[in-house]
């Protein structure tokens, strides 16, 4: 809603990923919809660490967010298991998202070793990119699971496991948002 100026707002939160502001240019020449200098109440960066360069690029006093997961669940449904239970197996991690590296980094952070299968963003999976994959386990994102779950031969592949993620936010961010809300009018 930052670009919808007619929308009444009490708080503005801008979320950047770990790549920061890219080339710093606005669409269509760059990745930004608004200039980094645009006023906002809170800046959140989804990155494993906030480097001085990243902090300077996004401006303000950013809060850190990390995506994490501890378990996976079969695409076909069933019991979820800890990611650690896949250690020692031949694993491929596949991601058809805008930044597959973030998914792969999260899995490495969970202690897994695997081969990477980056797919184009919004991949439709009709070509079954897993047919020739020699792995005991194929880990996929929740976003990709939505599409894979509609394709019968993929749902039947017992190697496919979905890795749900949760956002881990800086506790100070929630406190400051609540404090800011207390000062907002309810008109």
Go through each PLM region and give its residues:
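Short, charged/polar "capping" segments at the starts of alpha-helices
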Residues: 22, 49-55, 101-102, 125-126, ...
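Conserved beta-strand/loop subsegment of P-loop NTPase cores
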Residues: 12-15, 37-47, 59-69, 87-88, ...
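Short hydrophobic segments within beta-strands
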Residues: 15, 93-94, 139
């Amino acid at each position: 809603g930052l670009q919808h100026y007619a929308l009444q707002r009490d708080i503005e939160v801008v979320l950047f990923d770990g790549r920061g502001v890219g080339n710093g240019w606005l669409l269509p020449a760059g990745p930004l919809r608004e200039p980094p200098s645009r006023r906002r109440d809170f800046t959140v960066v989804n990155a494993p660490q906030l480097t001085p360069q990243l902090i300077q690029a996004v401006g303000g006093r950013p809060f850190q967010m990390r995506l994490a997961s501890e378990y996976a669940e079969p695409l076909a449904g069933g019991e979820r298991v800890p990611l650690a239970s896949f250690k020692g197996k031949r694993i491929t991690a596949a991601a058809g998202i805008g930044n597959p590296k973030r998914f792969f980094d999260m899995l490495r952070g969970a202690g897994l070793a695997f081969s990477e299968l980056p797919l184009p963003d919004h991949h439709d999976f009709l070509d079954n990119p897993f047919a020739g994959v020699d792995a005991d386990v194929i880990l996929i994102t929740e976003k990709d699971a939505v599409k894979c779950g509609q394709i019968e031969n993929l749902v039947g592949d017992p190697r496919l496991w979905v890795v749900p993620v949760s956002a881990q936010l800086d506790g100070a961010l929630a406190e400051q948002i609540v404090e800011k809300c207390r000062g907002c009018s309810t008109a």
